[in-house]
């Protein structure tokens, strides 16, 4: 049995084998895994919002936003030996948890989170190898840096690996 490192909402962490890393409660939030399969290190961020410009400066949490969480996660991974050029990404989440009468862009948080994460990963030149995003159901994800498998449990849809 592996030791599981848990990542809370608007949080991030890094692991090495035999540890795995997990986050629960991904609705409109996006869980992003960055991993170096040569060094066998991985990190996960539970991103709540697309853009740090939405945040209040006095209580700023870099792990909460797509544009700042991935930079922070990258620096934590490099601190434990990851090489930026070896990093790959997997992601899940970004569901539309509620339906709204209007097509107001502000209500599409899940889709906006996914778009912001993809944009930031492009800027960092980190390829996305697999994703399970969108839909209308919550997810729990767990990543194993040894096998490079992201296990995804989706409400009412069971479990799969990417």
Swiss-Prot record:
Keywords: Chemotaxis, Hydrolase
Gene3D superfamilies: 3.30.1330.200
Keyword Phosphoprotein among record annotations: no
Biological source species: Halalkalibacterium halodurans (strain ATCC BAA-125 / DSM 18197 / FERM 7344 / JCM 9153 / C-125) (Bacillus halodurans)
Subunit record text: Forms a complex with CheC.
Recorded GO MF terms: protein-glutamine glutaminase activity
Record-stated family: Belongs to the CheD family.
Name of the protein in question: Chemoreceptor glutamine deamidase CheD
CDD domains in the record: CheD (cd16352)
BP GO terms, sorted: chemotaxis
InterPro entries, A to Z: CheD-like_sf, Chemorcpt_Glu_NH3ase_CheD, Cytotoxic_necrot_fac-like_cat
